[in-house]
Design a protein with these regions (language model features):
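A short alpha-helical cap/connector motif
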Residues: 1-136, 143-164, 168-201
Length: 201
């Protein structure tokens, strides 16, 4: 890719991201505000839009979002829920759990869907869930969440259910040194993502 092509790709991505951000529902903007109040980074608008689109297109009615700092992803899924749907958000930190509870108080005024937040370590919590109970699993946050979710997914997912791993390039973690694009990045997230890709492929 030459410099002109690179710059055009960058401009295109910036345009798409700006447009998607402008289209985000109020609940998602509230999630971003909560993240900013705690000086936590939030994901791109495009990632949130992709999750919302996938949830809608797949017809998933029972969704679980796993990961510390996944407030924006949770909000985007919440905005796409039907009244009979169920959303469970799992966060291992008291701070993240509190943020989700605040967000769900607002979401409860917008939907009749079942909203549940759990303050637990996903590596221990997932094994206690009922099997064959979810259509969609979204995995975010700490490196340890990914292998735990991958291991439990065959048991937890219904037929045709799907698991989505966010930040597979390991660029969003605080200790990222370029993630998978940098072979020298040996941070926990980068190492875990390399192992996950090897396991999946």
């Amino acid at each position: 890719m030459d410099r002109t092509s690179f710059e055009n790709h960058a401009r295109a991505w910036d345009w798409i991201e700006t447009r998607e951000f402008a289209l985000e529902p109020d609940l998602v903007h509230e999630a971003r505000t909560l993240m900013q109040e705690d000086n936590d980074p939030s994901v791109s608008a495009c990632e949130g839009a992709m999750l919302s689109m996938f949830k809608t297109m797949s017809g998933a009615s029972s969704v679980i979002v796993i990961g510390t700092g996944s407030l924006v992803q949770t909000a985007r899924i919440a905005c796409s829920l039907n009244d009979d749907d169920k959303l469970t958000a799992v966060d291992s930190t008291p701070q993240g759990h509190s943020q989700i509870k605040r967000l769900f108080r607002t979401a409860a005024t917008m939907t009749r869907a079942t909203l549940r937040t759990v303050n637990a370590d996903p590596t221990q919590f997932l094994s206690r869930l009922n099997g064959d109970d979810y259509d969609l699993i979204v995995v975010c946050g700490d490196a340890s969440n990914y292998p735990a979710a991958y291991e439990q997914a065959p048991r937890l997912l219904r037929r045709h259910g799907v698991i989505i791993f966010t930040d597979v390039l390991a660029m969003e973690s605080p200790d990222s040194k370029g993630g998978l694009t940098n072979p020298a990045d040996r941070g926990d997230k980068a190492v875990a993502m390399r192992e996950l890709i090897d396991a999946v492929t």
